Amino acid sequence: MPEGDTIWRTAAALRRRLDGQVVTAARPQATLGRLRGRRVVGVEPVGKHLLIRFDNGLALHTHMRMHGSWHVYAPGERWRRPEHLARAVLETGDTVAVCFLAPLVELVADDRAAVRHLGPDILDTQFDVEEALRRAARSHADTLGELLLDQTVCAGIGNIHKCNALWQCGIDPWTPVSSTDAATLRRVLLTARERMRRSATARGVPRQPGVHGRGGRPCPRCGTPVSVRAQGMLARLTYWCTRCQGPGATRRR
């Protein structure tokens, strides 16, 4: 699933090509046809959500879930995915923006309402970590690993940055939320934010050490084979180092 840093980069790419441009065609016609002739006035990432705003007050709200993505082409350029996978197409004089496979594509009159349920966006320049901590205190998540994926607590963190931020902090993903103090959670959130900020703004694919995707391979820090197990109701695969993130790990580091 694209995480907040990926959506941030996507929004930046769309903003460069669409901001201030007039839509000459929009498909599907039945749902997006009324965007024809409208000017794009903003592109904003909100956690894992993306909003494209128009001068008539409407906004195109998309969420990529597991397999969705936005592509940008020149008119006449061959698409890298089949046309039948397109869920939204916006054309301007020099750009064709195509959203493929997104399960959520909707035109909304109140874009704030569409994302009101989300916690503070971790990549927002005004990220409110204290509000995220207040929301965490009300979360029903049992473990710290599950809490970090709760988008109503903090929007944007996904499984990759969850695993790697916890590893960097030396904290077991199965640590009960009930035994996690605010200082520890603040440190994890700010670590995830910094990792995601570097990822969002780096040229190319940034190389940051971590354990995600390394099940059975050596931990980059201590060499212990990385463990992997499904976690939470969604059974997301969680990667962690039993030595670096076990009892006393913070002291050893």
Predicted regions and their residues:
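Structured catalytic/nucleic-acid-binding cores of DNA maintenance enzymes
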Residues: 1-253
